[in-house]
Amino acid sequence: MLAHLDIDEKSNEIPAAQVLLASLGIPAPLVTLDALHCQKKTFEAGATADATLIVQVKDNQPTLHQQAQDICTTEAQLSQASSRDKGRGRDETRVVTVFDPGEILNGSEWQPHVAAIIRVERTVYIRSTKTGLLNRTSETAFYVANAMITAAEAANATRGHWGIENSSHYTRDVTMGEDASRIRSNPGVFARLRSFAYNILKANRIGTLAQDRYRAALGGLGRLLKLLGVGQR
């Protein structure tokens, strides 16, 4: 967890993400964002921070979403990468393709911000525990990037994004009890403390995070100091 920013009750995640981009302090970072952040001001903030942005586009930007789909059917493919994961009755194939925007965005308000269109096609077969039959699901997602990027880079970035969504956010919500918290006075302070504890436990991981949290709670001050690296030679 590199940064944590409180969101004002009268605001939302969009301006907060723009502020966060400006304060990362990481040279030329690659940042992935949900469709909520597919905003021109966010791309402007990314350009100021010298960041490469990969942002999902959905129907909250209907014109751009349709243009992205049109580009993927009419313009040249620049690169493509595929991967397959099998295990525990699950078989997933991902095909990531990067396209040149061509002339479709010419003259549009998005033209200065979009250097590449990314299509992610995902097909999953899951074996039913009841029937033994494979159930197939498929989905296609579209992303826009403010810099040219290879399909392999886009594949790693988009997959890593959902890995964070599934692991970090779930852990904070369930293992660290964020969803169950009823703290109303300075909740941001406690959110930062959870992030601090999460980072320490993850850096000293032995078993599952829930098990390590339990061990740390039983270990007293000595165990906590050891996790923090205090007093070690």
Which residues are covered by each model-predicted region?
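Electropositive, glycine- and tryptophan-enriched low-complexity nucleic-acid-binding patches
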Residues: 1-29
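Short amphipathic alpha-helical "interface-anchor" segments enriched in bulky aromatics
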Residues: 148-182
